[in-house]
Structure formats: structure tokens, C-alpha cells
């Protein structure tokens, strides 16, 4: 239930700690009522702090995003006041930290937060997008912690424009969780509570005009559902049309994913969960990549408004990936990934486990539980191989552990290896365990054991990770580790696929597309692809195929012409010039399929991985 408060009055009174809070309490008010200048005003009233000096710390990075951001760079007009509303002396110590000399005199702090979503050095879903018709923020972009006390409780009031709705996964101050979505998203001053800074920082926010207030440039559409013992909210902020008609289908597939993964772990590590989706139309899609970010009981997404076939193919694995993170990384993680130090860059060797194993299960569980056909999973394996082949040569020279430690690994060029080489190594690891134990053990058993330990608050030291894999699987993995995780040996994927009765995957060359200025852009393409053979190159804008302008509604149909025609004419734009280029297709020569005489063990292993 939303508890409405008179924010101005609260800012001038002493705030008492709600039950369960630590000694300090922070009461924030975020004013979204005037965002024409692409910034929001934040007011903070601290209570219960006794230091002679006080500090305010914005985070260096956001959990799940890993890359260094320095959120303090987007803070302006930082001021502190005493009870007479006189300004106090403030010294900015670095990008993210402010010191207030008279700590005991501080009654209020104010600052502005600038829009940061267009900073291409950071991930969209870790930043803040502040506009007159929409608001999205990862909480690390808005809030810091006071007096170095990350255990202090917090309350947040969001002051909204008339007719707006806001979604946030935090509790109401009463402790009531999501009693009624129509009330919880009430447009007037929604109010939330966090028990500590970790909880506050892990709660993303989206807000926009309500759909029933009339068609706007952006609007928010919500649905709710129950699955098992938990409640789920789905909130989509969009200026497109896809979700108007497809929300019920979206909820159906989200429920299927939730069922699959909670059934897999026999575990639901939350009471409620929120899916927050920012879905721009094609013409308003930022030029940088789509994606998502996991949180303790929510996930947020930047996913373009599109046709349903494209949505099912491209986005269901993304939802599956972020949801699996509830176990693998939010609960199962090394000591370096929690409790968090928001002032230091994380130097962990285990991101290959957090991202690569998660990406593997995101796809294999969709197949295992019948959400996608098994053949789709094998196509995913083929796609991972193509993506890995297109990674920069310098990145290929690094092991998965080196990429994990390397700060630049979350640059898009290198990050692709976490989501291509990473799941391939996870598949190979699963097959290694299954084949050497006659399918008595698997990577599933390893993840179950990690989860059982993590339920009781046990993290693992980085140096203990592989020994724990060996303990839980019952086999020596030193050679596998030295070659494919610590080392950079070529991945013998075909050899491992044979362990589950699969022949070599077909390869016709891969293409990676981006979006800019309302056009599809070739980000990269395999040299074996027909487009590359015809002379197209990275950076070209794809305008039309056989004279028909490309759009989200027809790109699948036009791309499928390669199956029925021997050639097409592709219109591109390069260096400001438009040209038509003939493209000739050839059929893949290496087929994909089931081994004609798979062993009984291979059949059993295949069933264990993809269900049939």
C-alpha cells in the first residue's frame, strides 16, 4: 500500500526511525515534477547521526554493471543546511564524495541529478534517463549513503507530475508488499522503504504517464500475476504499439520462465518480483545496445518495441538470463561481490561464472521446459560460435578469467565473449561432468550445491571456486580449467556436442545489427556471410531489400528471402551516399542434426540438457 505523505512538512521535522532500521535514517524526496532541463532535484533529511563531520558518498559503480561509472559526476548544486536553513561548508573530496564540516548541524542536504543515459561509456540500465515524458533510473544514479553508514535505513518519496504512474520494487513504509498494483502505482507521491543502502541501491525506478490518461509520447502499462508463492508485477514504459496488444502474451511467457527456473532450483528467493521494461519504438531507440540488469527482486530492461516473432526469438532468453541471476550472482557469488564496496572497482575472476553459466542456463532451461524447441537451443549454440569468432583479436587472446578482471571487459567489443565463449564453456563443462560420471552428475548438481550453501549466507573465496566445482561434481577439473577458463585453448565444441549425439552445427556466417537514426546498422559481420562477400562492411546502414524499406515488421520476412531466392538487391547508405548492391546466396554445406547412431549415454545426456 502507498502511504501518502506531505513531503514539505516532513522535510522540516525530525524523522524518527521506523522499526527495524539501524541507528541512522535517511529520508529522500525526489522531485520529478519539472524535468524540462533533464534533471531531478533530490532532498535528503538525515537523522540519528552523531559525527562531528559528515560525508556523503555516491557509488563508483553499480552491482551487476561492474564497469566504473562515478555517479557523482552527474551531481550538481550539492548543498547542506542547518535547522535555520543556513548553508553549511561543503568540500568535494573527489568525484563521488562530499564532506560537511559541521556534521551534527546537518538537517537537510539538496542536490540535482543530471540525465546520464546517453553516456555511452556506461550501460543504459545502470544510469538515469530523465525526460518530460519518461523517467528511468538505476537507484545508484540517484542516491548515495551518509556518514559511511550503509546500514542506515531509508525512505523515499517520489513527487510525480499529475497523471503519472511509478513502479519500484521496494516495500511501502508499512512493510506491506504490493497489496494492489492500482494502489501501489498511485500517481501521487509514492513512498518506499529500504532497510539499508544495498537494498535501496538495488531498486530501479520507472515512471511515465498512465495509459488511461490518453496517448502520450511515452506511457506506462502494467500487469500483475501470481506464480507459486510469489506475486509479480510487469511494468512497460513505451512510446510504441507492440505492448498494447501483446501484454497478455508477455505475461504468459514470463510466467513460464518463472515456473521453469523456480522449479529448477526448487526455490523462490523473494516474496515479490518486478519486471521493469523500457521499450522505445524503433525511431526512438538509442544507438547503443539493448540489454538488461538484474536486481535482488527485480530486473530492468531496454528492449525495443517490435514484432512478436522477433520478440520471442530475441528477448525471451534475456528475460530468462536476468531471472536466473536471482540465484547465480545475487545469491551465489564470491566474497568480492558482496557485501559491496561501492568505492572500489571490483577485481573478480568469477564473472565468467556469473555471466557465462547464467547465459547457458537461460537458453537450455527454455528448451528443457518446452518454452522453445530443442532445435532453437542448438541454433543458439551455433550463434555463440559465430559471435565468438567475430570478437576482436585482442579479446580472443584473453582467458575468461582475464576478461573477468579486465575493466574493459564490459566494453561491448569484449563483453560479447562473456555471452558467447562463456555459455559455450558452460555447455562443455556440463557435458564434461555428465560424460565422465555416466550422467550421474551434471552442472545442475554443482549449481544446486552452490545454492544450498548460499542460502545460509556462504560465499566463496575466488581461489576456492574451482575446488568447489570439483567437490560438487566429484571429478578432477584441473585440465578443463587450465585449458578453457584460465587458458585460451580453442574450444572443441564439436567434440563435446558429440557427447550428446549432435553433429556439427551449420554455419552460414553471422551478422550483428545495431540501430541509429531509424536505420539498421551493420555492427559487424562474419567474412563468410553473403553480405560481406558482396562488399558490405561494418558501419553500413541497411535501407532496403529488393526496394522494400527495412522495418521491424518486415526484417524477418525480408531476411528469409535468402532461403527462396539466389540473390537480392540490398540498398545501403555509406558515407552519406546511397547505393544498391547485389547479394548472392550460397547454401551451408555442413548440416546440423542428430548423430545417426547416438549411444544410449548420449541420448540420456541430451535429454538431461534439453529435455528430449
Model regions and ranges:
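Juxtacatalytic substrate-recognition/specificity segment
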Residues: 44, 223-350
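Non-catalytic architectural context of zinc metalloproteases
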Residues: 45, 68-77, 81-270, 288-291
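C-terminal recognition in membrane/secretory proteostasis and scaffolding
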Residues: 362-363, 371-612
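Bacterial N-terminal signal peptides that target proteins for export
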Residues: 1-8
Amino acid at each position: 500500500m502507498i502511504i501518502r505523505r506531505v513531503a514539505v512538512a516532513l522535510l522540516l521535522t525530525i524523522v524518527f526511525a521506523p522499526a527495524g532500521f539501524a541507528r541512522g535514517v535517511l529520508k529522500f524526496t525526489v522531485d520529478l515534477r519539472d524535468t524540462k532541463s533533464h534533471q531531478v532535484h533530490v532532498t535528503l533529511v538525515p537523522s540519528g547521526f552523531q559525527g562531528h563531520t559528515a560525508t556523503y558518498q555516491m557509488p563508483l559503480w553499480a552491482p551487476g554493471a561492474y564497469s566504473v561509472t562515478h555517479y557523482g559526476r552527474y551531481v550538481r548544486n550539492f548543498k547542506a543546511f542547518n535547522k535555520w536553513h543556513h548553508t553549511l561548508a561543503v568540500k568535494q573530496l573527489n568525484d563521488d564524495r562530499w564532506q560537511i564540516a559541521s556534521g551534527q548541524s546537518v538537517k537537510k542536504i539538496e542536490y540535482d541529478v543530471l540525465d546520464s543515459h546517453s553516456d555511452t561509456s556506461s550501460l543504459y540500465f545502470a544510469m538515469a534517463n530523465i525526460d518530460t515524458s519518461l523517467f528511468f533510473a538505476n537507484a545508484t544514479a540517484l542516491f548515495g549513503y551518509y556518514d559511511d553508514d550503509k546500514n542506515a535505513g531509508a525512505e523515499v518519496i517520489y513527487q510525480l507530475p499529475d497523471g503519472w504512474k511509478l513502479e519500484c520494487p521496494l516495500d511501502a513504509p508499512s512493510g506491506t508488499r504490493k497489496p494492489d498494483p492500482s494502489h501501489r502505482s498511485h500517481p501521487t507521491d509514492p513512498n518506499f522503504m529500504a532497510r539499508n543502502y544495498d537494498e535501496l541501491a538495488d531498486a530501479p525506478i520507472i515512471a511515465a504517464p498512465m495509459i488511461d490518461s490518453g496517448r502520450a509520447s511515452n506511457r506506462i502499462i502494467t500487469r500483475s500475476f501470481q506464480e507459486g508463492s510469489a506475486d509479480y508485477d510487469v511494468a512497460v514504459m513505451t512510446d510504441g504499439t507492440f505492448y498494447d496488444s501483446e501484454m497478455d502474451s508477455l505475461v504468459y511467457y514470463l510466467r513460464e520462465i518463472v515456473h521453469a527456473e523456480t522449479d529448477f532450483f526448487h526455490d523462490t528467493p523473494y516474496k515479490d518480483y518486478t519486471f521493469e521494461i523500457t521499450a522505445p519504438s524503433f525511431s526512438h531507440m538509442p544507438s547503443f545496445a539493448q540489454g538488461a540488469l538484474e536486481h535482488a527482486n527485480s530486473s530492468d530492461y531496454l528492449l525495443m518495441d517490435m514484432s512478436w516473432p522477433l520478440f520471442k526469438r530475441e528477448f525471451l532468453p534475456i528475460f530468462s538470463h536476468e531471472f536466473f541471476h536471482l540465484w547465480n550472482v545475487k545469491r551465489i557469488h564470491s566474497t568480492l561481490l558482496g557485501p559491496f564496496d561501492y568505492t572500489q572497482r571490483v577485481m573478480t575472476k568469477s564473472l565468467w561464472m556469473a555471466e557465462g553459466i547464467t547465459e547457458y542456463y537461460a537458453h537450455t532451461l527454455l528448451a528443457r521446459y518446452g518454452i522453445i524447441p530443442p532445435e532453437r537451443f542448438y541454433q543458439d549454440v551455433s550463434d555463440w560460435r559465430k559471435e565468438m569468432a567475430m570478437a576482436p583479436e585482442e579479446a580472443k587472446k584473453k582467458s575468461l578469467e582475464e576478461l573477468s578482471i579486465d575493466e574493459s571487459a564490459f566494453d561491448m567489443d569484449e563483453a560479447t565473449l562473456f555471452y558467447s565463449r562463456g555459455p559455450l564453456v558452460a555447455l562443455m563443462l556440463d557435458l564434461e561432468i555428465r560424460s565422465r560420471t555416466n550422467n550421474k552428475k551434471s552442472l545442475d548438481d554443482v549449481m544446486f550445491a552452490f545454492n544450498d550453501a548460499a542460502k545460509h549466507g556462504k560465499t566463496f573465496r575466488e581461489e576456492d571456486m574451482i575446488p568447489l566445482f570439483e567437490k560438487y561434481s566429484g571429478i578432477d577439473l584441473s585440465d578443463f580449467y587450465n585449458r578453457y577458463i584460465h587458458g585460451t585453448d580453442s574450444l572443441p565444441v564439436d567434440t563435446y556436442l558429440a557427447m550428446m549425439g549432435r553433429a556439427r552445427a551449420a554455419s552460414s556466417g553471422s551478422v550483428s545489427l545495431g540501430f541509429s537514426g531509424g536505420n539498421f546498422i551493420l555492427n559487424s559481420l562474419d567474412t563468410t556471410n553473403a553480405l560481406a562477400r558482396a562488399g558490405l562492411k561494418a558501419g553500413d546502414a541497411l535501407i532496403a531489400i529488393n526496394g522494400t524499406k527495412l522495418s521491424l515488421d518486415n526484417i524477418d520476412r525480408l531476411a528469409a528471402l535468402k532461403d527462396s531466392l539466389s540473390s537480392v538487391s540490398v540498398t545501403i547508405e555509406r558515407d552519406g551516399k546511397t547505393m544498391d548492391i547485389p547479394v548472392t546466396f550460397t547454401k551451408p554445406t555442413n548440416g546440423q542434426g542428430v548423430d545417426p547412431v547416438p549411444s544410449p549415454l548420449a541420448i540420456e545426456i541430451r535429454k538431461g540438457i534439453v529435455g528430449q
